[in-house]
């Protein structure tokens, strides 16, 4: 989808309070280090180096924001959060960043949707499930949520079907999709879903569309 291809760097922040206030829908990408988060963002936006992928997983420790929409008319923002759970960083750094991400996911007012990336060969980890539990109140209040099973090309079709079934049970509802940057599996579908989330049909508009045509229109 062309809308995703308009993505451009907006800002980066090491602390939550350094992030600017955003008045458009914000979609956060989160996941365990090495789940393919940066690759996913770069594939969706068709930009090889938009999201930085460190050669040492767990070393990217900033929240990066990317604007979407025409220049001067941003209509959504992507947030790339640091990967979590990798042993290469110190315990104190891991705990600090887990707290920063938790605060972001629970309190960020402009947050409209969360995309949780997961390696289907590993399934949802304890940290993934802890994240799900932390944001569940917001999801129940209307926050959109997608579990994206990356690296789908590593699985057979039967294995993909099994992974989808198991993850849907673990996630307790919500969207679950397979994704492969290599095979471009799920790319268009995910891009379309994110666009819909960033451009919700207002109830008033939906009601007008649902009305039968008037006699003057017949």
Swiss-Prot record:
Residue ranges of domain EngB-type G in the record: 23-200
GO annotation, cellular component aspect: cytosol
Molecular functions (GO terms): GTP binding; metal ion binding
One GO biological process term: division septum assembly
Family statement: Belongs to the TRAFAC class TrmE-Era-EngA-EngB-Septin-like GTPase superfamily. EngB GTPase family.
HAMAP family the record matches: GTPase_EngB
Function (record text): Necessary for normal cell division and for the maintenance of normal septation.
Protein name: Probable GTP-binding protein EngB
Gene name of this polypeptide: engB
